[in-house]
Every structure is written in structure tokens, then in C-alpha cells.
A protein has these predicted regions:
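Active-site- or DNA-interface-adjacent structural scaffold in DNA-acting proteins
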Residues: 1-58
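Generic secondary-structure signature for well-ordered alpha-helical cores
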Residues: 19, 99, 150, 154, ...
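Short coil/turn segments at secondary-structure boundaries
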Residues: 26-28, 42-44, 158-163, 248-254, ...
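Polybasic low-complexity intrinsically disordered regions
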Residues: 33-109, 115-128
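Short hydrophobic alpha-helical runs that function as membrane-insertion/retention elements
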Residues: 129-134
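An anionic, glycine-rich sequence signature occurring as long contiguous blocks
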Residues: 135-239
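Short amphipathic alpha-helical "interface-anchor" segments enriched in bulky aromatics
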Residues: 224, 228-262
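A short, flexible helix-boundary coil/loop motif
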Residues: 251-322
Length: 322
């Protein structure tokens, strides 16, 4: 190749590339190592959707394009994605993605939108476990669960006999953040729900208190899980689910995904795969090597200006993919 292809050529290529084949090519260099990693028990797979906001005003799209991604926690590696039109199609897309993945001995974490019996049954049928946030879309189930973790009720209840608890306190950037996980020890009150929700073994809540100067905010989130484990582990799963939110944020802030003007759905999907791959390899390199600047955008710019630095990142990731 004598020169870098023009934008039109790149655009035409992206329109005809098979996204699945592209993903295989990008991740194939360490596919065998990845397979070994996926055999480890209790690995966490975070699944969430992200809307490509720039597609909202494009005539070619009936609804804004929405990409559902499965992220291997701690490794920041995308295991797969499904592209749909609009967030309203996210629920069936998540089920389709779960159906494609090998989730045996994995813990699938999902937000409240996916607290659905059919989704839970699919996860259990594939020998996986789930940790899913519970919200008002489940009517009386949510109300009954939330009542057990209401502060007024907990103040008069015997916490030691009714709840298993675990607390973490983090200080930094002028704030103190306290997270407390309360796990119900006795689920006798929820017998009817246990029969309806496959594999349900734990009902718990996470109380998050943030103190900045003299201001304090409190937030309580309720969850259901098929994983029969400790309050410490359950709190860890809820915290690590934040990684996929952070991952999507990086795609916007560092790679400008929400500002992309690409019209083709196929091209947007391919670009999403490439962006996620770039974020994964640079993030991994920054975390494990001594670099002057720790931001992803700064290291991306360095890759453009220093070819050897780009080679160093790719070489490191080939040998240390996870």
C-alpha cells in the first residue's frame, strides 16, 4: 500500500465487512488464552446496552441504534454484542446474546430492565448464575422486597438475626463513600416468589451513602441472585457491574462514539467493535506499565505520533491479553 486510504474508501470497506468476522480477527490473536480464562469458575459477565446518540436524527434509522455488549469483568474484554434499533428492543437482544455465549459457571449481572422471568430461566438453563437489580417493573415483588430493607423497618428489626451484612468505606477526592450490603437470611416470606423465579437463592440490598463536605446522600438498591454466596461477594458483583458503564463512558469521551455521523448500521457496528478493542488494549497497557500519562486519550495520541509505542501496546496485549 503506497498511502493511507481516503475516508471514502474506508467507509466503503466498513459497509461490507462482516462484524462477526471482524471480531474474530481482532480477538483471534489471543483466542486460546481467552478460552482458558473463560473456563475459570465464578467469572463475571456484565451485560448492558448503549445507544449511539448520533443516529437518533438520521433518516436511515427508524430509531437510534442500540448496541448490547457482554463485557468480561476485570479484563475489559468484549465477549460479544448485538445491534438493534432502539432501546425498547434491548430485552430480546440481551436474551439472544446470552444464548450465543458460553456462560457455564459464570455470574451474569444485569440492570433492572432485565429483571424478567424469561431471562432468568435462560441463564439458569445454561448453567449460569445471575445478579439482577430489582425495581418497580416487578410490582408487588419489588414492593415486598423493598419493605424488608426500608430504613424504618431495619431500625426496629434485629439486624444480626435477620441480615448478613458487609460494609466497605472509601475515601478520596473530598468524599467518603460507604457501601453496606444487607442479605436476607430467611426467605420464608418469599416462598411464592422462589417458585416463580428460577434458581433464586439470595435477596439483598446495597445501601450507598456518599458524604461530600457536610452534604450526605443515601441510595438503596435491591437485587435478586441465584448465587448462594456471601454478602461480601454479592457486593463485589454489584460494584463490578459498574465496569460496563465505565466502558461505555470511555467510548464516548475518548472515542467520540455519540458524535459519530456514520449512517450505515453495519459500519457503526464495525466501528463499535474496533473502538472497544482499542479501549481494551490501551487500558490494559496503562494499568500494567509505567506511562507518564494515565488517560486513554493521551496514550491514543501517542500511538498516532509514535509508531513504536503502538507496536509496544499491541505486542504487550498479544502476550498478556487478560
Amino acid at each position: 500500500m503506497e498511502r493511507i486510504p481516503c475516508l471514502t474508501t474506508i467507509s466503503n470497506i466498513l459497509k461490507i465487512i462482516n462484524p462477526e468476522e471482524l471480531e474474530i480477527c481482532l480477538y483471534g490473536i489471543f483466542n486460546n488464552i481467552l478460552k482458558q480464562k473463560l473456563k475459570i469458575k465464578d467469572k463475571q459477565i456484565c451485560i448492558d446496552g448503549k445507544t449511539v446518540c448520533s443516529t437518533a436524527n438520521m433518516k436511515e434509522h427508524e430509531k437510534p441504534m442500540h448496541i448490547v455488549t457482554a463485557l468480561l469483568a476485570d479484563a475489559s474484554v468484549s465477549l460479544g454484542q448485538i445491534t438493534v434499533d432502539g432501546k425498547s428492543n434491548e430485552i430480546p437482544a440481551v436474551r439472544e446474546l446470552i444464548g450465543l455465549l458460553n456462560i457455564k459457571d459464570s455470574v451474569i449481572t444485569l440492570d433492572a430492565m432485565h429483571c424478567q422471568k424469561e431471562t432468568v430461566e435462560l441463564i439458569i438453563s445454561k448453567d449460569g448464575d445471575y445478579v439482577i437489580q430489582l425495581k418497580g417493573n416487578q410490582g408487588t415483588f419489588y414492593k415486598d422486597v423493598y419493605a424488608m430493607f426500608d430504613e424504618k423497618y431495619m431500625d426496629i428489626a434485629d439486624k444480626d438475626s435477620n441480615y448478613e451484612t458487609y460494609k466497605t468505606i472509601e475515601k478520596g477526592h473530598g468524599r467518603i463513600e460507604t457501601r453496606t450490603c444487607y442479605v436476607l437470611k430467611d426467605l420464608e416470606y418469599f416462598t411464592d416468589y422462589l417458585a416463580e423465579w428460577w434458581g433464586l437463592k439470595k435477596i439483598f440490598a446495597v445501601k450507598r451513602e456518599v458524604e461530600i463536605d457536610t452534604q450526605k446522600t443515601t441510595e438503596i438498591s435491591c437485587y435478586i441472585s441465584s448465587k448462594n454466596t456471601s454478602a461480601e461477594k454479592l457486593l463485589m458483583y454489584t460494584r463490578k457491574h459498574w465496569q460496563i458503564e465505565s466502558f461505555h463512558w470511555l467510548l464516548d469521551v475518548n472515542l467520540g462514539e455519540d458524535d459519530s455521523k456514520v449512517i450505515s448500521k453495519n459500519s457503526q457496528t464495525c466501528l463499535n467493535i474496533i473502538r472497544k478493542f482499542c479501549v481494551s488494549i490501551i487500558k490494559k497497557y496503562i494499568e500494567n506499565n509505567s506511562v507518564k500519562r494515565k488517560t486513554i486519550i493521551a496514550n491514543m495520541r501517542k500511538c498516532l505520533l509514535n509508531e513504536q509505542f503502538l507496536v509496544d501496546i499491541l505486542t504487550y496485549y498479544c502476550h498478556n491479553p487478560l
